[in-house]
Amino acid sequence: RVCMGKSQHHSFPCISDRLCSNECVKEEGGWTAGYCHLRYCRCQKAC
């Protein structure tokens, strides 16, 4: 399912851990708990 979350700079839809990871790499961070932090990427599970 599609969940919405926020990176450090903007909001974008997350569909899978892979997509979240790819998007956050562009932000020089990782997707974690709805935010980009360090290099760890996890899609926000709750919508």
From Swiss-Prot:
InterPro entries: Defensin_plant (IPR008176), Scorpion_toxin-like (IPR003614), Scorpion_toxin-like_sf (IPR036574). PROSITE patterns: GAMMA_THIONIN (PS00940). It comes from the Eukaryota. Keywords: Antimicrobial, Disulfide bond, Fungicide, Plant defense. It holds the Pfam family Gamma-thionin. One of its GO terms (biological process) is defense response to fungus. SUPFAM superfamilies: Scorpion toxin-like. The keyword Cytoplasm does not apply. Disulfide bonds join C3-C47, C14-C36, C20-C41, C24-C43. The keyword Phosphoprotein does not apply. Gene3D superfamilies: Knottin, scorpion toxin-like. Belongs to the DEFL family. Protease inhibitor I18 (RTI/MTI-2) subfamily. This is Defensin-like protein 1. It comes from Sorghum bicolor.
